[in-house]
Amino acid sequence: MFYSLSVKNFILIDELEIEFSKGLCVITGETGAGKSILLDAILFCLGYKTSNNIIKHGKDYTVVNIIFSLNEKIKKFLIQNFIEPEELLLVKCLQKAEGRKSFFINNQIVTKTLIKQLANYLFELHGQNNNITLLEASTQRDILDSYGDLLEFRVKLAKCYQIWQNTRKEIEEITVKQNVIEQEIDYLNFVTEELTKLNIQIGEEETLTNIRQDLQNKNKDLQLIRDIIAQINNPEINISINRAEKLLARQRDNDRFKAIATSLEEAYNNLEVARQELSNLLDSFTYEEYNLEETEERLFLIKAISRKYNVPANELGIFLDKSLEKLVILKNKIANSHKLQAQEVLLQEQYYKLANDLSARRLIAAKHLEESLNQELKQLKMEKANFKIEIKTAIDPTASGNDDIVFKASTNPGMKAEEINKIASGGELSRFMLALKTSLFDKMIKPSIIFDEIDVGIGGEAADKVGDRLKKLSSVTQVIVITHQPQVAGKADLHIKIEKTQLEQETKIKVKALNLAERQRELARMISGKTITDASLKVAKELLYPVACPHDQK
């Protein structure tokens, strides 16, 4: 609820501070006294659109502070927006002549958007030009569902709707991308088959590179052996040695040639040994595990695949694993599409079953609310008015159900019921809202409700009934009323008077909380005008009797 309001340099106000109370708070004053300025100050502080010229003439800034009491919803909102709750809630708006507005919550600077979101938790405003929320379809739906205790059921429906819509969205995404997904599956099938077949191991490229180098070195040795064998296997060598031996055999008795013959024989034997060793060495190369041609082919293939997929050879195995994982996911998407379609049908059936149930409950609640509100309108002296709730099947289902809900009314007999905003004046709309609030009573109630001149165009018994309903409503929430009716003001728990004083150089506004005697004179003024008579004082005293002597009331 509103705890206090302080204003400085705002339009005609130099500086003022008002403390509010629980229950019914009324604000009165002569026409043109500036009652609406207080309302403008509240709206200014809470981020609503106000007139441009709000800074008092001759001043370079204006500031408005409002202190509110807290409830659990407000505390939760503050915590969700990283603002530490304190014992009371301080909201401030500062505007300098040359700059934009600055908003604060508990002295922490915040955005205008956040302030307006917070305001939804703090109060409602109903008046000549401020019944916009009543005209919104969402508000009318919420009013009906609150009256019929259907909000929890609606939460259940909303959850079902959300799951249904998420499933539909997933199906649509798969359908739109199905061709792309199928192409990607074909590509990944090819990739995984190719890489699986190649079976490239981690470190294989490095191993094969080393083997190739080794084989290249061995091939050089092999070629050398073959060249040597080719030389020593030359038939001319054996022929030459045989001829030399035959020539030496003729000189076997000559001691000078014996040593040469022996050396020549040893040379022949050594040559045979060399041939054998070279042959054995050659045979050992024949059974190597790798050959250079195969190794180079494998290396070429690995490098080509690495370039093809732009993946380092050492990471081709990881690339294969990831491709296999992605392939499984995409195949599951296609497979799940059919499951999702079946699931979507079931969810749709479940949604419409719940929505139809909600519609049936709304029809029952609408009938009872119509009866209750029409009875309240009679109490507010709008006997000729007739309130109706029209419920039609919506074109598109929503999280709130499958109904279009429209509040309609006729204000005179024989008139066709039209949408409530088309047939009701600002004051009538306010009384419609008062009737709704009284019918709902302890439901959909915010900490504070402000009614701006709800009693315009009525008087006498009708004004008294409006006052009774406001008083009843104030038992469950703080009600602040700007009024011209003494019957309404007489029922207040707190009476605030606004006076405007015209000086030579400027106009000033004074705000005061009245005591009982002051209230009597103010009510008398409201009854008889500027000239207060004994008769008006007597009537004022009678209006205040329930306040002055509460224990005498039954």
Swiss-Prot record:
GO biological process: DNA recombination; DNA repair; SOS response
UniProt-annotated binding residues for ATP: 29-36
Keyword Transmembrane: no
Disulfide bonds: none
Signal peptide: none
Entry similarity comment: Belongs to the RecN family.
Role according to the record: May be involved in recombinational repair of damaged DNA.
Protein name in UniProt: DNA repair protein RecN
